[in-house]
Amino acid sequence: LTQELPAWLQANRDVRPTNNAAVGLSMAGSASLILSVYHPNQFTYASSMSGFLNPSEGWWPMLVNISMGDAGGFKANDMWGPTEDPNSAWKRNDPMVNINQLVANNTRIWIYCGTGTPSELDAGADGGNLMAAQFLEGLTLRTNVTFRDNYIAAGGTNGVFNFPDNGTHNWAYWGRELQAMKPDLQAQIGR
């Protein structure tokens, strides 16, 4: 994402290797922010939609492990090693832990998370899937609100935070939010 792909895209698709955006949904939300922490010239815009923004905190490693297992039998420790190590990749890949660098980089950020309360966008959803989508979004909201508060306390002023009164862990909400974010993203990266 940060070396081979940008060079290939520039050579073959005329896509510049700097001043790009990273947008992540769900577990990829924290990754989009971390990409901008460590590669600020490449990713001047980062967005997390319903992301887990403090994955090294408390019980989040266990929840990430459960999610990864459900998504294909993967194990979180195989990704970032044991959480007990204070220098672990869990900390290096945690937006909350790295919030001061994100602020120092002046990355434009857009953070979205619903409350877990369904709306018309959930009409026709399967009951079991809806219950899981409600649970995940409600669970995730706390880290997003805490991230906003810590970002502002660290002096961050280049962010949009959208926490509407409803929204589940569902593509319909993310699609709507992407459309709302699009003008801001285009203005930032000049496309």
Region spans (language model):
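Non-catalytic cap/lid and distal C-terminal segments of serine-dependent acyl enzymes
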Residues: 2-191
